[in-house]
Structure formats: C-alpha cells, structure tokens
Amino acid sequence: MEENLEIEFKILITKNIYEQIISDYKITSSYQQTNYYLMHPILSELKDTLRIRQKNNQYELTLKQPQIKGNLETNLIIDKKTKDKIIKHELITNEIFDLLKPYQLDSTMFITDHFLTTTRNEINTEYGLICIDYNQYNGLEDYELEYEITNYTLGKQYFLDFIKKYNLTYNTNCSSKITRLIKSLNNNK
C-alpha cells in the first residue's frame, strides 16, 4: 500500500481544444483506463472517493481523502479476482477496507455498478504530468485537461501559461470525474 498527495489543476475543454493539444504536441500514443466507483452515502458525506482503476489488465484500489490542498491517495494493487469479488459485494479484507472500519463500512456495502472510461494522453513537464482526457460515462462524453503536480505554486503558473495558449481560463477545478458521473445519474432519473 502506498500513499501520495495528489495535487492537480483541471478544467473541462472542448473536443476541438482536445484535438488541437494532441496535434500541437504530436501525441501519437494513448491508453485506456476504467474507474469503477464504489459508492456509499457515508463516503459522500466525508467527500471521500473509493474506486478501482483498471489499466492494462492491472487493478488498483484507491481511497481519496480531501486535504487542504489536494487529496491524500491511498493505493493498493489488487488482482482481477479481488476486483470481481468487490464488484459482486463479497467480503474482502485489505489495508484500504481497514481504513474504512471506523465508519462501519466493508466491501459488501457499496454500490458498484457505475464506471467511467478514460482515453488518456500525457505530456511530461518539469513540474508534473499534463493529462488530456476523453471520458465516457453513462452514455455521455467529455474532454478534460488535468495537470498533476508536485509543487503547487510553480505548477499552477505553468498550468496557467499552458492553457493561455489555447485561450482558456482557470478559476477553480472543474467537478471531479465521479461528481460528473453522479450528476449524470441524477439527470437521468
């Protein structure tokens, strides 16, 4: 199990801007990842997120917990068998679910039928990683630009300079992927 502080700036962009950035930076390879969200009202109250990310037939269980700047991510590599058991509401014990015990939550208690698939393109920079994402969820699609950084001040300035080239502005982060997914579910009721 590993922990890291995720600090990122992110905005929604249009398909045209998405394609322009990929063209400008001559990005020729991308990869797909699918986030399976494990939802529960207690996590929503805490503003925590629990997900399983599938990428290249590898699986990672992640608990995200908000901090003053960014999110504390606690990650655990799991196998497909464990992922399938969690999705089927079977009891699993591991370090991530141990963190949820104080809230009387276990692996059997989550809504597990919502997922989001991202086609991700990346640009490495001196301050972090720019991700140009095409997201598909619940019959919808959107385009997102994320900048995952290690130094808040230097990273923010780099991000502002980067998006300025595309006549984009930044005030605050757009809604998270899970928030957009939940909103789409509520709109379909």
Predicted regions and their residues:
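Phosphate-end processing signature that detects enzymes handling 5′-triphosphorylated RNA
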Residues: 1-189
